[in-house]
């Protein structure tokens, strides 16, 4: 959250605020550089976040200097050459990271992301002129209380404005990722994007197609973790970026739902995302959980169903989410969780469910994911604009599930009283799908009746299952 008092500070009060927050260790690092005869300034996002009351959110401290990387490496014991090609090294001092970059201006950008080369310069003013946004183009020397603000960044902080340093067209052609970063900063800070800057975002958005999927993913994740991600996602739609980032979500704008929802599919998805907990997995799950509704509606209409219904929309939503997650290189672990949450978010518990049905539900969803699935259901309810919190039936289901978990019921194949080795030894089998199929069939029996989970009983049941599977296989081969 932003400290509103901070952005109302005068120039002199800004200096006082910076002086009060900067740590002794940071002063030691700066003094080490200055005592060696070089200039050293705190710069960029670190200053911005201090002035906005967000210093605790900024892990790295950014420093600009006229010292070359090799000269910095001689001054400190632990230095990592993180971006030495572009003049950047990272100093580790008392477990704090300091990203130190030589004053520079960037030469021509060949890949719309990185400069082909950099040219070192001797003063901070030239260095600040190459930066992306005015609120990031600040520099401060705490030893003489000099705050350099060549591009009215302090004023833009006060006005809550995201504005490029200089010509937005040139800034975006230099580094197209700045297009997404502008929207991400707008979302995380709840700032407006200056009119000319936003016009150029709309004109230049196709440049993002030249940026790696991983870079866009990282910016999108940061946007999702803002206090109100719907703010940033709406900017993605207005700027036409959403049309190629998540085209299915973009096309859900204006797709009306039934009387149980106050909002269309698009805004319902955004508000559900806002209502979910601050994790990438939960926010993506909430954002995509209903994105398959337009396709589901089309399929229903094509089948002659005239009502405004969305049968199997969770199936289509999972497919759309999977496509996005693979395209933007999310981890397999995240993909597995997100797709499973979307797949099962339409669960419908009634009091007629048997204990076996409850166990089967926990088994297919996974015990670890149950709390996340319920959290998604709550976010879904909040996002429809009419319902808030847990209905009584959902609380009853939650209690039932917790009882099953507390009583250590067998819910997975590994919970069975026998394993694959027992199956192979008993029937003289080698590792195969047949062994796995027998274990799956045994688990289905145990989910219905926990009393069956005894070794002698399961081996007896396994023999019946084995004979049936072999018989079915023989009949299939004869029909061939």
Tell where the protein language model's regions lie, with residue ranges.
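Catalytic cores of the polymerase beta-like nucleotidyltransferase superfamily
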Residues: 1-480
């Amino acid at each position: 959250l932003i400290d509103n008092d901070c952005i109302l500070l005068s120039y002199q009060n800004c200096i006082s605020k910076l002086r009060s927050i900067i740590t002794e260790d940071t002063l030691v690092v700066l003094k080490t550089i200055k005592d060696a005869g070089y200039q050293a300034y705190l710069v960029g996002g670190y200053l911005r976040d201090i002035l906005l009351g967000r210093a605790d959110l900024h892990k790295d401290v950014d420093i600009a200097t006229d010292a070359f990387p090799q000269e910095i490496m001689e001054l400190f014991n632990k230095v990592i050459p993180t971006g030495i090609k572009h003049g950047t090294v990272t100093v580790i001092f008392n477990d704090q990271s300091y990203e130190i970059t030589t004053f520079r201006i960037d030469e021509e950008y060949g890949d719309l992301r990185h400069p082909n080369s950099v040219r070192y310069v001797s003063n901070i003013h030239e260095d600040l002129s190459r930066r992306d946004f005015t609120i990031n183009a600040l520099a401060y020397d705490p030893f003489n209380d000099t705050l350099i603000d060549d591009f009215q960044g302090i004023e833009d902080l006060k006005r809550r404005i995201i504005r490029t340093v200089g010509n937005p067209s040139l800034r975006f052609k230099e580094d197209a990722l700045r297009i997404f970063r502008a929207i991400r900063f707008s979302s995380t800070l709840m700032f407006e994007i200056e009119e000319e800057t936003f016009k150029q975002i709309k004109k230049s958005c196709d440049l993002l197609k030249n940026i790696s999927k991983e870079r866009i993913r990282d910016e999108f994740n940061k946007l999702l973790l803002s206090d109100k991600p719907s703010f940033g996602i709406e900017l993605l739609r207005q700027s036409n970026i959403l049309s190629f980032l998540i085209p299915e979500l973009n096309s859900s704008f204006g797709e009306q739902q039934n009387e149980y929802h106050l909002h269309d599919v698009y805004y319902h998805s955004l508000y559900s995302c806002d209502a979910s907990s601050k994790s990438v997995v939960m926010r993506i799950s909430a954002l995509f959980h209903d994105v398959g509704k337009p396709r589901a509606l089309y399929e229903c209409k094509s089948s002659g169903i005239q009502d405004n219904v969305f049968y199997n929309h969770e199936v289509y939503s999972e497919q759309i989410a999977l496509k996005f997650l693979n395209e933007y290189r999310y981890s397999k672990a995240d993909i597995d969780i997100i797709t499973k949450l979307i797949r099962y978010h339409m669960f419908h518990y009634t009091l007629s469910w048997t204990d076996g049905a409850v166990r089967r539900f926990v088994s297919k969803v996974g015990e670890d994911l149950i709390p996340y699935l319920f959290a998604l259901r709550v976010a879904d309810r909040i996002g429809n604009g009419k319902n808030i919190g847990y209905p009584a039936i959902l609380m009853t289901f939650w209690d039932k599930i917790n009882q099953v978990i507390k009583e250590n019921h067998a819910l997975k194949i590994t919970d069975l009283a026998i394993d694959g080795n027992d199956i192979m030894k008993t029937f003289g089998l080698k590792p195969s799908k047949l062994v796995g199929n027998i274990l799956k069939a045994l688990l289905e029996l145990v989910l219905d009746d926990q009393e069956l989970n005894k070794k002698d009983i399961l081996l007896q049941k396994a023999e019946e299952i084995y004979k049936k599977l072999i018989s079915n296989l023989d009949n299939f081969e004869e029909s061939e």
